[in-house]
Regions:
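Exported/periplasmic ABC-transporter solute-binding proteins
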Residues: 1-29, 35, 40, 44-53, ...
């Protein structure tokens, strides 16, 4: 019998997985060995032949890895989506990002907006800036951008500590962070879909499928919603 399932997990799903893991472990009498990775690190793990039983990874990363022959999962499915969102330190002004006009006004009202440095292995900042450029907000956003070396959760933590006035990253890397007020998801015009794909590796033990079944259940879906993810049907 397998005593441990090795899991490769995207940073955007980290808060959910850390909440889900103890419940699954208690119910099934085994341990989840969790490895969290940015998209670039996920790719590097796959290129290096990293061994794992199951995972929740960014869908586009898995699709590219499959196309390149680096991943051959037994099966996979779209588990959840994390929209892009914005947050400010708790106690700050109640700003709005509900519409594109609101978002533009909020940017203009701030002096610094933290983004994850692409060197950290995530492409969120590039996607956000490209969308802002198309909408005429790029110059304003770039003038305020502060790039922090780390995934979105680290960037949000830095904002909570006062290193910048706001953060833009995945909602699931803002909502769970203590000391951050989640302003809401960015307007649809600014969105890029970050889908989380759950997968079972080829020749994985039956417990890996049990984890997939659990992730599809209502308890898991409720936890996902609580950290800013939108579960897929």
């Amino acid at each position: 019998m397998t005593d441990q399932l090795d899991i490769l997990c995207a940073g955007g799903f980290r808060a959910a997985m850390e909440a889900l893991a103890p419940r699954f472990e208690a119910a099934h009498g085994l341990r989840l060995g969790l490895t969290f990775a940015t998209p670039a690190a996920t790719r590097a793990h796959l290129e290096a032949g990293f061994s794992f039983h199951a995972g929740v990874v960014v869908a586009s990363v898995l699709a590219k890895a499959q196309a390149d022959g680096l991943a051959t999962p037994a099966h996979s499915f779209k588990l959840a989506v994390s929209p892009l969102g914005m947050g400010t330190p708790e106690g700050g002004p109640a700003l709005s990002v509900a519409t594109l006009a609101d978002f533009g006004a909020t940017i203009a009202a701030l002096e610094s907006i933290a983004l994850s440095d692409p060197k950290a292995g995530t492409n969120v900042a590039n996607e956000v800036l490209a969308a802002a450029d198309k909408l005429g907000l790029g110059e304003s956003l770039r003038a305020r951008a502060l790039f922090i070396n780390g995934p979105g959760s680290v960037v949000s933590g830095a904002v909570a500590q006062g290193h910048a006035q706001a953060v833009i990253t995945l909602a699931s890397e803002i909502v769970p962070i203590e000391g951050i007020r989640f302003l809401g998801r960015l307007p649809q015009e600014m969105q890029t879909e970050y889908a989380m794909q759950a997968l079972v590796a080829d020749r994985a033990p039956p417990a890996a499928q049990a984890l997939m079944d659990y992730l599809r259940g209502e308890e898991a879906r409720e936890i996902m919603r609580g950290v800013g993810l939108e579960p897929c049907s």
